[in-house]
């Protein structure tokens, strides 16, 4: 029950992270991915993925939980839909790997693997809208990757600290 409550809290944090948005062309800059990382690191593959999948499902049902207060299935089939589905698969992979070993280097490696999945799906879908893979990469990857790597590092540090506090309790 405790893990379900934590998953619900992380779903809410992902929503808040989506609402903190700076429009940059077809893909806005948000804090969603930061909370996707954090949920996967802290909750692991099962509950981290549940938190992210719940977020995507709430948006698909029409609740305005996505970036720029958008919601509805049209967002999932739009230019940023690949990133949203990538969040689910990325959270699973990050959580799966993070459960194997609790170390900063391992968390970074698992985060990079998850981020790669998020970007691969995101750019793949975005390409269908911009009709040019180079443009999809230049607008859906290049402006964000360094910021997302910073978010990954911060999420890993926070997650390790939270886990240490939980063990000490």
Swiss-Prot record:
* Membrane spanning stretches: 9-29, 47-67, 75-95, 106-126, 139-159
Disulfide bond annotation, renumbered to this chain:
none
The record's Pfam families line, in alphabetical order, gives:
BioY (PF02632)
Record's subcellular location? Cell inner membrane
InterPro entries xrefs: BioY
Naming one, the record's GO cellular component terms include: plasma membrane
How is the protein disposed in the membrane? Multi-pass membrane protein
What's one GO MF term for it? Answer: biotin transmembrane transporter activity
Q: Does the keyword Ribosomal protein apply?
A: no
Name the UniProt key words of this record, in alphabetical order. Answer: Cell inner membrane, Cell membrane, Membrane, Transmembrane, Transmembrane helix, Transport
Write down the Gene3D superfamilies for this protein, in alphabetical order: 1.10.1760.20
Domain of life of the native organism: Bacteria
Transmembrane helix keyword on record: yes
Family to which the UniProt record says this protein belongs: Belongs to the BioY family.
Q: Cite the record's note on assembly.
A: Forms a stable energy-coupling factor (ECF) transporter complex composed of 2 membrane-embedded substrate-binding proteins (S component, RibU, BioY), 2 ATP-binding proteins (A component) and 2 transmembrane proteins (T component) upon coexpression in E.coli. A stable subcomplex with both A and T components are also isolated. This complex interacts with at least 2 substrate-specific components, BioY and RibU.
Question: What task does this protein carry out?
Answer: Substrate-binding (S) component of an energy-coupling factor (ECF) ABC-transporter complex. Probably a biotin-binding protein that interacts with the energy-coupling factor (ECF) ABC-transporter complex. Unlike classic ABC transporters this ECF transporter provides the energy necessary to transport a number of different substrates. The substrates themselves are bound by transmembrane, not extracytoplasmic soluble proteins.
Protein name, per record: Biotin transporter BioY
Q: Which organism is it from?
A: Thermotoga maritima (strain ATCC 43589 / DSM 3109 / JCM 10099 / NBRC 100826 / MSB8)
Identify the coding gene. bioY
């Amino acid at each position: 029950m405790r893990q379900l409550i934590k998953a619900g809290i992380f779903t809410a944090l992902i929503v808040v992270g989506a609402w903190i948005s700076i429009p940059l062309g077809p893909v806005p800059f948000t804090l969603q991915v930061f909370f996707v990382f954090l949920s996967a690191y802290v909750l692991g593959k099962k509950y981290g993925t549940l938190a992210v999948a719940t977020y995507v499902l709430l948006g698909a049902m029409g609740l305005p939980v996505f970036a720029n207060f958008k919601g509805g299935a049209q967002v999932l089939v739009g230019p940023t839909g690949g990133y949203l589905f990538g969040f689910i698969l990325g959270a699973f992979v990050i959580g799966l790997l993070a459960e194997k070993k609790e170390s900063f280097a391992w968390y970074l490696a698992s985060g990079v693997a998850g981020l790669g999945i998020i970007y691969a799906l995101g750019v793949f879908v975005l390409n269908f809208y911009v009709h040019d893979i180079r443009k999809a990469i230049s607008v859906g990857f290049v402006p964000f990757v360094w910021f997302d790597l910073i978010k990954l590092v911060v999420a890993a540090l926070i997650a390790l600290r939270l886990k240490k506090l939980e063990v000490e309790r």
